[in-house]
């Protein structure tokens, strides 16, 4: 949504200071940012129907066929789960959308989101008997038993190393350090 679009645009303009904020690539980045969650399997019952609707919409709002292909490829191949078994190389615009979406999972907002998601799905906050797993398949990622603290070790701490762009690498590092401090404090308090 809005934060992903703002962050993706800000990072692109940081990496390309001579670019204009009202350029074609910025329009592609922002459109991809707004559309990226519309086909998320966690919230969308029929992704193929939504993809068809987006395919019809993009030319009507002024995108060329190539630009529309970039947007569609990005939103279909940018998710963490889509890249567990195979890494997809996204167009430059898509790299900024993917990085911004992943950065949303980091830092203070990422911590809040992790605990909100865990609570909503009935996950334990922490259980020392449940060890973090190395996630190697989409099915394992979607179906394994996890705790919220394990989610930091199984996914969130790894996102920093998956960033594509210079500005994202810098921001991801800053937010990951904050999360590491939080998890260390949590473990110190847990083990009193």
Q: Predicted regions span which residues?
A:
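Alpha-helical phosphate/pyrophosphate-handling elements in metalloenzyme active cores
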Residues: 1-29, 41-42, 57-61, 82
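Divalent metal-dependent phosphate-bond-processing catalytic cores, especially two-metal-ion Mg2+/Mn2+ enzymes
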Residues: 2, 6-21, 35, 86-192
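His-Asp-centered metal-binding catalytic motifs of divalent-metal-dependent phosphohydrolases/nucleases
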Residues: 22-44, 50, 72-81
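Residue-level detector of well-ordered alpha-helical segments, enriched
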Residues: 25-30, 67-71, 107, 152
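Helix-adjacent hinge/juxtasegments
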Residues: 48-94, 103
